[in-house]
A protein has these predicted regions:
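Class I (Rossmann-like) S-adenosyl-L-methionine-dependent methyltransferase catalytic domain
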Residues: 1-49, 65-72, 76, 86-139
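A conserved beta-strand element that flanks and buttresses the S-adenosyl-L-methionine
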Residues: 57
């Protein structure tokens, strides 16, 4: 399997790469600096080097994107996943939005609607509280 790990922070990416090398050795994934939404050059370079993916996983990123950036990031993910692939999105729904700190409050329907309009189908949804217990969506 081809695994490509990405992060928008160079120092965090280097830390993750070092830990993966220590744990996995030769089986470690490749690592790329990639911000969402990616600039056109980064996106084209990534797709020139790698195939489309059977699964794309994003955790704790999308709530930091403005509406325009979220749309651009979603377009990138739609391009990155194969036609029968899976997109897994993890976002906190129970914190206050704060544009000054670059966090935007959206409910689960906002995310589901965006990705469904891009051709994805919602297969499953879980809403948990801040400690991981089954919870509810705060509005």
């Amino acid at each position: 399997a081809i695994v490509e790990a990405t992060d928008g922070s160079g120092p965090l990416l280097k830390l993750a790469e070092a830990r993966a090398q220590a744990l996995l050795g030769a089986e470690s994934p490749s690592f790329s600096l990639l911000c969402l939404p990616p600039d056109k050059g980064s996106e084209d370079a990534l797709f020139a080097r790698l195939p489309r993916f059977d699964a794309v996983y994003t955790c704790g990123v999308l709530q930091h994107l403005s509406d325009h950036e979220l749309y651009e990031g979603a377009c990138f993910m739609e391009r990155a996943v194969t036609d029968k692939g899976t997109l897994i999105v993890v976002v906190p729904l129970d914190h206050k939005g704060d544009p000054d700190r670059k966090t935007f409050l959206r409910d689960s329907l906002d995310y589901a609607t965006l990705f469904e309009r891009m051709g994805f189908r919602l297969a499953s949804q879980e809403i948990r509280d801040g400690v991981g217990s089954p919870g509810h969506e705060c509005r």
